[in-house]
C-alpha cells in the first residue's frame, strides 16, 4: 500500500511530487525547507532554517503515523558548508539520541536563493530487527 501526503506548498503540484510517501513500513520525506505558506522565512539564519525544515519533516512523518525516532536516514543540502556548526546543532537537537545515518552536502543553490538548507528523510516503522 502506498500513501501520499502534501504540505500544500505551491510547487508540489507544479513539479509533480508529494511531501512524503509511505510505501509499506518505509516513509520517504521529500526535501523540506524553511517556508511558511510558500514564503521563505528566517532568511540568513542557517540554524533557524534548519530547525524549521526539520519541523517540516516531523510534520510530514506525523501525518503518516510516524515520529522522529522512526527516522533512519537524513540528507541535508546546504548552500554554504561553513555554516555546518549551526546546521548540525539544529539537527542534533532533533536527532541527537536517535542518531540516524546522515549526510550533509554543499550544493550550488536551492529552489529559492534565500534558502540555505533543505532536509530530506527516510523513516522505518517496521519491526526493530534482531535483538
Q: What residue ranges belong to the model's regions?
A:
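Short, polar/acidic, helix-capping and beta-turn segments at strand->helix junctions
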Residues: 1-131
Amino acid at each position: 500500500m502506498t500513501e501520499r501526503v502534501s504540505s500544500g506548498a505551491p510547487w508540489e503540484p507544479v513539479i509533480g511530487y508529494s511531501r512524503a510517501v509511505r510505501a509499506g513500513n518505509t516513509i520517504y520525506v521529500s526535501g523540506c525547507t524553511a517556508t511558511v505558506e510558500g514564503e521563505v522565512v528566517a532568511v540568513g539564519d542557517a540554524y533557524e532554517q534548519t530547525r524549521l525544515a526539520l519541523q517540516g519533516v516531523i510534520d510530514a512523518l506525523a501525518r503518516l503515523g510516524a515520529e522522529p525516532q522512526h527516522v533512519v536516514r537524513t540528507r541535508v543540502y546546504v548552500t554554504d558548508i561553513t555554516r555546518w556548526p549551526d546546521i548540525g546543532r539544529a539537527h542534533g537537537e532533533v536527532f541527537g539520541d536517535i542518531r540516524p545515518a546522515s549526510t550533509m552536502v554543499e550544493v550550488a543553490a536551492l529552489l529559492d536563493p534565500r534558502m540555505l538548507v533543505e532536509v530530506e528523510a527516510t523513516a522505518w516503522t517496521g519491526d526493530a530487527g534482531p535483538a
